[in-house]
Amino acid sequence: MTAATIIGAGVAGLCVARALLDHGADVVLVDRHTDAGPHACSWWAGGMLAPFCEGESAEEPVVRLGCEAADWWEAKTSAVKRRGSLVVSLARDTSDLARFARRTTGFRHVNGPEISNLEPDLADRFAKGLFFESEAHLAPRLALAQLRASVLADGGAFVQEDADPDEYAQRGLTIDCRGFQAKDKLHDLRGVKGEMLVLSCPDVT
């Protein structure tokens, strides 16, 4: 039986661990933290599973493989919601919406009443839009917790340690999933900046 050590228990490490367990491997997860939390990039992820929208600027493999992502996450967790993606623009920006449509697939055009049905809070504000019905989103923190629990429940082991990948590699198959922390080995590695903003203002529509 194949045995593998995975260093890093963020989203990448957990996905690798789950996939290897599903193929009958013995898996050990090693991370310097006991649980997922604010220290991990994936803790702050938006959770969009929107490969067709990503296709506006992403390469073909992102779209092709991304189309499988919602099914995978739905099979492994209960964190997925399939409600589609709605893209709208102000009247003065309809050329941008048309450009977005030219660069993407997997959508249908929607008019004002359809937009109102999809998103009542947008009623009477937009005359046209694009609806990517097959797209989804997940709750990242719930997904991380459930994926970790399933890995441990199905025989995966966990070691809390600030691991040296080179040391583990001498013992056997080792997969480095430390993310940005791997910059000590991959000197040109860079992070992708993102922001999360949560707004709650019930009195303003």
PLM segments and residue spans:
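Short beta-strand/turn micro-motifs composed of small residues
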Residues: 8, 31, 89-90
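Extreme N-terminal leader/targeting segments of oxidoreductases
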Residues: 1-4, 128-129
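N-terminal Rossmann-like FAD-binding beta1-loop-alpha1 element of flavoenzymes
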Residues: 3-28
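Helical element adjacent to the flavin cofactor pocket in flavoenzyme catalytic cores
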Residues: 126, 130-173, 177
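Dinucleotide-binding Rossmann-like beta1-alpha1 core, especially the glycine-rich loop
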Residues: 46-118
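Short loop/edge segments at beta-strand edges and connector loops
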Residues: 31, 111-112, 158-163
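Flavin-dependent oxidoreductases
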Residues: 171-205
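Glycine-rich FAD pyrophosphate-binding loop
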Residues: 22-41
